[in-house]
């Protein structure tokens, strides 16, 4: 097997808050994949950094009464500590506010500019007259122009999933002051993305991408690529644009360059690793980004186009994952399920979560649910009851009957050959990011080993005379099987693996060691490696999280003069044909981050199909059979995925969205008045 040379990154956490379990999904996924590559003997480097620029950081530092640099140092130290607590093994964790990143950002920009890829044009944008600052999209809220949902951000609606310009919002207000923004003109710099349309279409066919993301990208191409605004006006926290007064690079320009900046800093500290080998020269190296599905646009369009324009190597692949829900719902501060990484670590071992997340992950772009009851049961059953139990059951027999030394040859090797025979299957699962399948394969093998113990019954043999050799054989087979299982799970459970290697008196194991049996080998006395999760521990975690976040909650800024909607007459209301509809089927729409597709029974109106942008808030299966409130006479809307024939009504606020449900006495087709 030839040695591969691989660069890997996770998306950069924003340096404006703490790491939470949503972040950990991505970093656990990336870390497992990197550890697997290293276990196979490949040269694999994993870097990350804090995303350290933007208006939000400037305002946060101002609010705390410190400089942005002081804030960034505090947050970066906290982030590094949290990631290390979860056994995330970054080779280097940097910051985008660094000399390396400034130099690379300027180099890329100047190259793009010299090749004619940078445009200038005057734009009008919203400005807070009280704070005297141009407002980023996420600092503007108002009523969605498509579905009329209140308090939606300036770039997209979390209720219906629509995207729009901040100027399209109805009754917009600044989240900083509550003031109504005014329009103000400014000259901005744009990256001419449409020039790269043909290149991107070609790259997307060659790159390692998931089918769902290819569908999404096809949708974006169909809509047409637009020049990308890469500048922001002072006051702003970031890198100044060369030869441009009071202009700064938009955070999303220098943030992905941060992957390169972090790797360059690592290479400067480790001279045997060449930055140019991975990013400048056409060597046989690989480059992969692990990201959330919500930032695919930046990583699959802007980023490869920038690299192409600057004459740098492009990503070999970009791997997207879904969002994390807890107990089937969006993470909630009020329910205590918005859990910070450091809060989790106060109560539970990191490998519990690493294992559970791994068991849920696949190569698909799917959301992951952390069901806390299932989490406890799976950890207790799989890790404590099946895996660690093998060592705890067999080690005492080896100590008692063979002086802690395994046999010189296995008389019955069928079970061990079964385990070794799965090595390439499990390796393929890891390589393809099918971690859930890999875990299931390993646990099926653990079941087979436990069945072997139950069949051979060494505890019965121990009561008979003359059975020492047979018992030593059984214990040696089980401990060898335990060693193999530990190697298979080492990318997921690095600390348990290290403890197991110490117990077995082995040097750090690699994938190649699968074929090297542990014969005539002395082991140490067994000591517990993992404890069961108690329900009380989970309850304490939730309570701690709830109390911690309650203390941080502040009253949100309200618009200073946000008028209510204009009055309507009863005749206006009567124009709406509101009906009760029964959900016959509901499923996620492949290629869409937000949409669910409903098949509805509307009584005498027949069957209707509706698309609704509520995927983040509801699991499809929980809605089947429910009675919902349906707008029957809304004009059908043609979408990429089909025609939406009406609308399902929901209630929402800043934190949550819930479909309106009718009680059990209602029937499909009933009118609402």
UniProtKB/Swiss-Prot annotation:
The keyword Protease does not apply. Residues 572-673 form the tRNA-binding domain. It comes from the Bacteria. Its EC number is 6.1.1.10. Binds 1 zinc ion per subunit. A motif ('KMSKS' region) lies at residues 330-334. CDD domains: Anticodon_Ia_Met, MetRS_core, tRNA_bind_EcMetRS_like. One of its GO terms (cellular component) is cytosol. Keywords: Aminoacyl-tRNA synthetase, ATP-binding, Cytoplasm, Ligase, Metal-binding, Nucleotide-binding, Protein biosynthesis, RNA-binding, tRNA-binding, Zinc. GO terms for molecular function: ATP binding; metal ion binding; methionine-tRNA ligase activity; tRNA binding. A motif ('HIGH' region) lies at residues 13-23. Its main location: cytoplasm. Its cofactor is Zn(2+). It catalyses: tRNA(Met) + L-methionine + ATP = L-methionyl-tRNA(Met) + AMP + diphosphate. Is required not only for elongation of protein synthesis but also for the initiation of all mRNA translation through initiator tRNA(fMet) aminoacylation. This is Methionine--tRNA ligase.
């Amino acid at each position: 097997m030839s040695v591969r040379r691989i660069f890997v990154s996770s998306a950069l956490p924003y340096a404006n808050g703490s790491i939470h379990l949503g972040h950990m999904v991505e970093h656990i996924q990336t870390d497992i994949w990197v550890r697997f590559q290293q276990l196979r003997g490949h040269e694999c480097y994993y870097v990350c950094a804090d995303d350290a620029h933007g208006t939000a950081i400037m305002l946060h530092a101002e609010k705390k009464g410190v400089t942005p640099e002081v804030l960034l140092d505090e947050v970066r130290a906290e982030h590094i500590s949290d990631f290390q607590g979860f056994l995330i093994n970054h080779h280097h964790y940097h910051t985008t506010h660094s000399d390396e990143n400034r130099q690379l950002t300027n180099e890329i920009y100047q190259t793009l500019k010299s090749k004619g890829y940078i445009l200038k044009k005057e734009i009008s944008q919203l400005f807070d007259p009280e704070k005297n600052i141009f407002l980023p999209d996420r600092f503007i809220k108002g009523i969605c122009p498509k579905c009329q949902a209140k308090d939606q951000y300036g770039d997209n609606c979390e209720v219906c999933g629509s995207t729009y310009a901040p100027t399209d919002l109805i009754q917009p207000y600044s989240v900083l002051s509550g003031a109504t923004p005014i329009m103000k003109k400014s000259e901005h710099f744009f990256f001419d993305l449409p020039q790269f349309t043909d290149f991107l279409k070609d790259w997307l066919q060659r790159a390692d991408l998931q089918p769902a993301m290819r569908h999404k990208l096809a949708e974006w191409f169909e809509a047409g690529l637009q020049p990308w605004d890469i500048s922001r006006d002072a006051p702003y926290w970031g890198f100044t644009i060369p030869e441009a007064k009071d202009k700064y690079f938009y955070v999303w320009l220098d943030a992905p360059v941060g992957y390169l900046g972090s790797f360059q800093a690592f290479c400067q500290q480790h001279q045997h690793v060449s930055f140019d080998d991975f990013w400048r020269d056409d060597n046989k190296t690989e480059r992969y980004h692990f990201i959330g599905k919500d930032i695919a646009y930046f990583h699959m369009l802007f980023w490869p186009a920038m690299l192409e324009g600057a004459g740098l190597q492009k990503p070999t692949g970009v791997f997207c994952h879904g969002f994390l829900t807890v107990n089937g719902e969006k993470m909630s501060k009020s329910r205590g399920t918005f859990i910070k990484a450091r809060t989790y670590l106060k109560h539970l071992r990191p490998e519990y979560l690493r294992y559970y997340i791994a068991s849920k992950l696949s190569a698909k772009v799917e959301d992951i649910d952390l069901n806390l009851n299932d989490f406890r049961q799976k950890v207790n059953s799989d890790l404590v009851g099946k895996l660690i139990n093998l060592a705890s059951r067999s080690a005492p027999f080896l100590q008692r009957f063979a002086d802690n030394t395994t046999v010189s040859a296995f008389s019955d090797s069928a079970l061990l050959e079964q385990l070794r025979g799965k090595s390439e299957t499990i390796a393929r699962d890891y390589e393809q990011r099918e971690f859930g399948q890999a875990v299931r394969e390993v646990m099926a093998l653990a079941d087979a080993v436990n069945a072997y113990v139950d069949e051979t019954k060494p505890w019965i043999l121990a009561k008979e005379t003359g059975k020492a050799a047979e018992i030593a054989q059984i214990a040696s087979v089980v401990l060898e099987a335990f060693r193999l299982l530990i190697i298979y799970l080492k990318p997921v459970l690095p600390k348990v693996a290290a403890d197991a290697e110490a117990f077995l008196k082995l040097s750090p194991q690699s994938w190649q060691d699968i074929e090297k049996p542990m014969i005539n080998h002395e082991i140490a006395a067994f000591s517990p490696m993992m404890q069961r999760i108690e329900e009380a521990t989970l309850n304490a975690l939730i309570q701690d999280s709830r109390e911690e976040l309650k203390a941080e909650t502040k009253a949100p800024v309200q618009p200073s003069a946000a008028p209510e909607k204009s009055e309507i007459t009863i005749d206006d209301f009567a124009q709406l044909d509101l009906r009760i509809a029964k959900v016959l089927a509901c499923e996620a729409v492949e290629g869409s981050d937000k949409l669910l597709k409903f098949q509805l029974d509307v009584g005498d109106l027949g069957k209707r199909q509706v698309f609704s942008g509520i995927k983040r808030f509801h699991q499809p299966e929980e809605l089947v059979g429910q009675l919902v409130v349906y707008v029957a006479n809304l004009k059908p809307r043609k979408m990429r995925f089909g025609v939406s024939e009406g609308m399902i009504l929901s209630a929402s606020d800043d934190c949550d969205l819930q479909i309106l449900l009718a009680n059990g006495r209602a029937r499909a087709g009933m009118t609402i008045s």
